[in-house]
Amino acid sequence: MRRFTESYLARTREGMWAGGEREALADLELASADRVLDVGCGSGEFTAVLAEESPGRVVGADRDPDLLAAADCEGVRADAHALPFPDDTFDVVACQALLVNLPDPARALREFVRVARPGGRVAAVEPDNAAVSVESSVGAEAALAQRARDLYVAGAATDVALGGVRDLFDAVGLADVTVRRYEQTLTVEPPYAEEDVRAVARKAKAADLRERRGVLANGGASEAELDELRRAWREMGREAVRQVGEGSYRRRETVPFYVTVGRV
């Protein structure tokens, strides 16, 4: 399973469920849940949403102690494949962007089912990273982002384009399965946040491509193709830096998430 930093989680989950737009979570029936578990909670962004929507006890579980320490919630150090809770404990067991990072998501779901009470709900909020779209004031950015994304999806060790997981829910015996789509929008525009300025500076260095080079190679790119992609990415990044300097850079990224809910 990939490991993430607190800053990465804060950046990638910025704006998720903001503004009270939480209709996609309706099937979790959080208003009637007394005990809720967020598995793979990280630094607690989704846990906080669950706590806002539920009147009951909300617990976050993650195997990374540093992320748990940053989460403003009741936290338990735990592996998603071996949750330290008795059978039939929770009314709702949920996760966000966890199954896409697991080599065997069905194994984790079976644990979710075990610790959920009969009649309780299991939910997974998972992205389809293959369907992410980018709009940018830098002309080359959208096409380059798509090229890098295609290679990343093809080369990743897990199914990062998992999205809706109805088949997995059916396979572990969950009933009344529903799937709702929710879109997360990440916007960069003036006045720029410090994190956005740093992210643009990373583009000019092609830092993300360097860190993911092995995965991109696994996706089918040759060394020459990766070198050319890096060259074009740095050129795009320098133009983005220039636009930030004059206050004209704008970027909009839309990530489709699918909220799959089933009943135990």
What are these regions (language model features)?
Residues 81-92:
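A short acidic, Gly/Pro-enriched loop at the edge of an enzyme's catalytic core
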Residues 106-121:
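A short glycine-rich, Lys/Arg-flanked "PGG" loop and its adjoining helix->strand segment in the class I
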Residues 127-206:
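Conserved catalytic/acceptor-binding region of the Class I
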Residues 35-37, 42-82:
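Class I SAM-dependent methyltransferase SAM/SAH-binding core
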Residues 91-106:
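A short SAM/SAH-binding and catalytic strip from SAM-dependent methyltransferases
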Residues 178-264:
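Conserved Class I S-adenosyl-L-methionine
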Residues 1-34, 45-46, 67:
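Conserved class I S-adenosyl-L-methionine
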